[in-house]
């Protein structure tokens, strides 16, 4: 393969990947509007998202949400379950377009001493005797010749870059 062929093939592959990503995003957007279509017909007016939004603000700090608790946003947990049956009939795949509520749930009260949700991990030092070599050796690999290694080091140490005027 020549360099031009590699560049062209890479460009085509990147284009195909980008088109797939765009197609998935468009499909998700269509599903979202399909689910919201019936709700907008009931309201008959454009909602003001700054005032009437049912979505709680997403916080990057999980501790802030857990401190305030889900009681701060009482309508958030109930508004998404009140979809009309007509909206469900129009769009059968509406069940997956509801926003996740995992950021409003508190973690289970188990053991507060263990952080990061993991169990205690025991570390053991490994000695050379504990490590077993694979059966059959290393096949065609040879031992490193120290004379050849030092000769290669000297050859590279003597090489110098030469700059010329352009």
From Swiss-Prot:
Pfam family example for this protein? FAM163
Predominantly, its location class is membrane
Per the record, residues carrying Phosphoserine are 40
Q: Which residues cross the membrane?
A: 6-26
Q: Which GO terms describe its cellular component?
A: membrane
Q: Which UniProt keywords apply?
A: Membrane, Phosphoprotein, Transmembrane, Transmembrane helix
Where in the cell? Membrane
State the annotated membrane topology for this chain: Single-pass membrane protein
Q: Which domain of life is it from?
A: Eukaryota
Q: Which family is this sequence assigned to?
A: Belongs to the FAM163 family.
What PANTHER family does the record tag this protein with?
A: PROTEIN FAM163B (PTHR31396:SF2), PROTEIN FAM163B MEMBER (PTHR31396)
Q: What is this protein called?
A: Protein FAM163B
State the species of origin: Homo sapiens (Human)
